[in-house]
């Protein structure tokens, strides 16, 4: 799902690509390692005989398939390259700009092949709707992660988070202080939402932010849908999926997205600013999970260990995201204190939708979003 330190401190506020052309090659069905461990059923590094044996098993597989991880999203470029350099395992990154639902679709379409994704990084609504596709696994740092941010068996674990924000090129549009500003004529043809809210976690939270700013709540996302319908009628809403290139080219001068992506945009566009609207502070975490049918099950588990290690968590922090183990690492003295202290404070009461609220909102979006903005 950002308040100066990790979103873990907000826990009390919450209850909580289709295959085309020739068929992909089939993967080997035997996931047993040289030491006799069934990697696909391993639920911890202990099942391999410890981390050293897990590393060996993953290196024997030699590859890891990831999906929907843009290089400039939460520092994934460095995370991937560091994993490759550390373990000498090739990371195959497919569809980097795909949405969460695309990850699930790819896993279903490519099931049984060596091209299927090994791991997922999903928005809340898509993750909770597909838990039967995940393999339970507890990383060595599992106990550091608050109960509110993980499945008890490790079927899914929240990994990093942030706040929904409005990023904008201050050389093109006036300063933004609220969601309502986006309806002004100065924003005509300039406002983009990162993704389709029925498929992408960022877009879902963007509509939730608009709902709260317009009298709705985590229980009532309808005002958010109405806001975007009005934004479209006013000619302000761009039906363009924004990314780093559209921001740099000026195609999408205003983007509703996670605040850590705004920080990444500012690194390339000097005039880019990011604001978290005080009247609609929406926080959210992404969900990390292993594909139960992963073609490289040992590498998938090593990837999880890396992401939730001190090094992996600090790499997300370097990208402006708030790592789920942040508070525990700060207490242990393993957090990057300079980066941790530099996280911007956010004013306002944060809203973290519960699982039930997310499901209800997702159902409403599925029934109403497309007809509202057509």
Whereabouts are the PLM-identified features?
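Extracytoplasmic ligand-binding site segments that recognize negatively charged/polar headgroups
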Residues: 65-80, 92-108, 114-251
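Extracellular/periplasmic bilobal clamshell ligand-binding domains
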Residues: 332-374
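Mature extracytoplasmic/periplasmic domains
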Residues: 282, 286, 290-350
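Short, polar/charged alpha-helical segment
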Residues: 49-63, 69-90
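Bacterial lipoprotein signal-peptidase II cleavage site
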Residues: 19-33
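Sec-dependent bacterial lipoprotein signal peptides
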Residues: 1-20
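A ligand-binding cleft/hinge motif common to bilobed small-molecule-binding domains
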Residues: 125-131, 248, 253-271
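Periplasmic-binding protein-like
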Residues: 148, 161-165, 225-230, 269-294, ...
């Amino acid at each position: 799902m950002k308040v100066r330190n990790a979103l873990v401190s907000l826990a009390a506020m919450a209850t909580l690509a289709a295959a085309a052309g020739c068929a992909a090659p089939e993967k080997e069905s035997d996931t047993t390692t040289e030491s006799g461990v069934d990697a696909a059923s391993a639920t911890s590094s202990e099942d391999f005989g410890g981390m050293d044996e897990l590393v060996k098993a993953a290196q024997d597989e030699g590859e890891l398939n990831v999906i929907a991880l843009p290089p400039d999203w939460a520092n994934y470029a460095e995370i991937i390259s560091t994993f490759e350099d550390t373990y000498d395992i090739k990371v195959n990154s497919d569809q980097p700009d795909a949405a969460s639902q695309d990850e699930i679709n790819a896993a279903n379409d490519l099931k049984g092949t060596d091209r299927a994704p090994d791991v997922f990084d999903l928005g809340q609504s898509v993750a909770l709707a597909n838990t039967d596709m995940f393999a339970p696994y507890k990383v060595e740092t599992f106990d550091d992660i608050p109960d509110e941010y993980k499945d008890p068996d490790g079927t899914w674990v929240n990994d990093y988070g942030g706040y929904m924000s409005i990023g904008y090129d201050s050389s093109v549009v006036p300063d933004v202080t609220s969601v309502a500003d986006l309806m002004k004529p100065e924003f005509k043809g300039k406002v983009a939402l990162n993704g389709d809210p029925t498929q992408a976690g960022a877009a879902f939270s963007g509509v939730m932010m608009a709902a709260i700013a317009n009298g709705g709540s985590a229980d009532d996302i309808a005002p958010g849908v109405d806001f975007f319908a009005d934004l479209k009628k006013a000619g302000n809403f761009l039906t363009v999926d924004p990314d780093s290139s559209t921001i740099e080219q000026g195609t999408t001068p205003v983007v509703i997205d996670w605040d850590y992506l705004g920080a990444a945009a500012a690194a390339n566009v000097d005039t880019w600013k990011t604001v978290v609207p005080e009247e609609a502070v929406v926080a959210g975490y992404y969900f990390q999970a292993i594909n139960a049918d992963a073609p490289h099950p040992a590498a998938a588990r090593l990837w999880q260990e890396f992401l939730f290690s001190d090094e992996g968590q600090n790499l997300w922090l370097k990208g402006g995201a708030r790592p789920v183990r942040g508070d525990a690492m700060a207490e242990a003295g393993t957090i990057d204190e300079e980066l941790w202290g530099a996280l911007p404070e956010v004013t306002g009461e944060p809203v973290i939708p519960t699982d039930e609220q997310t499901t209800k909102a997702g159902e409403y979006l599925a029934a109403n979003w497309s007809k509202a903005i057509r």
